[in-house]
Amino acid sequence: MRVIILAFALLLTTASVLSSATDPYLQKRQEMVRDDIRGRGIKDGRVLDAMAKIPRHLFVGERLRRQAYADTPLPIGEGQTISQPYVVALMTEALRLKPGDRVLEIGTGSGYQAAVLAEMVKDVYSIEIRKDLAETADKRLKELGYKNVAVKYGDGYLGWPEYAPFDAVIITASVNHIPPPLLKQLKEGGRLILPLGSTLFYQTLTLVTKKKGGDLAVEQMGAVAFVPMTGEAQKR
């Protein structure tokens, strides 16, 4: 473990020498990863590398950029938020992603979670029910060079059957049940993570693994607070 930590520290030091002149938020990003992500128990090196690389400040409004690397959610408009960095890392690590995976994200929001996924897997398919957010996130991701992310304006409850099955599904809005269409689009052996429970207060971060024959293994990971899933989810 000591070798891994030293190597990671060296990577950040090298990045600082090469990029500090062009990235005024580099030091804050390094501190975020060191203190709020690795410091709180995230061990997956690929998650750490992705979040050390991605300019989170470009996924929030200009007036919030100084706060972009604080371990807190921030508003992005239309009553939505960019998730707390630690929660992004926790959910991503729990999926145990592999480089060749194809991942479905429900709730594109700012596009930050999609960018983290895109650094780690082959393809990301992300659905956003709010048109303005979908278009803004799609434009931002393209400008940052992410060619392996497809953003769709639509109701994420229904998934994206044309590209199913998926190795993993991540839901970034609270819902009081596991959407059946998303379970159907999850590969056998695949993992789905979501904030499950009341859409008014706190939810339980829940990891679901689809076993052979469609059986589900469910693991509860602690309390979280997410904005509610809208659209079809509210009718159920």
UniProtKB/Swiss-Prot annotation:
Pfam families: PCMT. Its EC number is 2.1.1.77. GO terms for biological process: methylation; protein modification process; protein repair. It comes from the Bacteria. One of its GO terms (molecular function) is protein-L-isoaspartate (D-aspartate) O-methyltransferase activity. Keywords: Cytoplasm, Methyltransferase, S-adenosyl-L-methionine, Transferase. The active site is at 83. InterPro entries: PCMT, SAM-dependent_MTases_sf. Its main location: cytoplasm. It is found in: Cytoplasm. It catalyses: [protein]-L-isoaspartate + S-adenosyl-L-methionine = [protein]-L-isoaspartate alpha-methyl ester + S-adenosyl-L-homocysteine. GO terms for cellular component: cytoplasm. Belongs to the methyltransferase superfamily. L-isoaspartyl/D-aspartyl protein methyltransferase family. PANTHER family: PROTEIN-L-ISOASPARTATE O-METHYLTRANSFERASE, PROTEIN-L-ISOASPARTATE(D-ASPARTATE) O-METHYLTRANSFERASE. Catalyzes the methyl esterification of L-isoaspartyl residues in peptides and proteins that result from spontaneous decomposition of normal L-aspartyl and L-asparaginyl residues. It plays a role in the repair and/or degradation of damaged proteins. NCBIfam families: pimt, PRK00312.1. This is Protein-L-isoaspartate O-methyltransferase 3. It comes from Geotalea uraniireducens (strain Rf4).
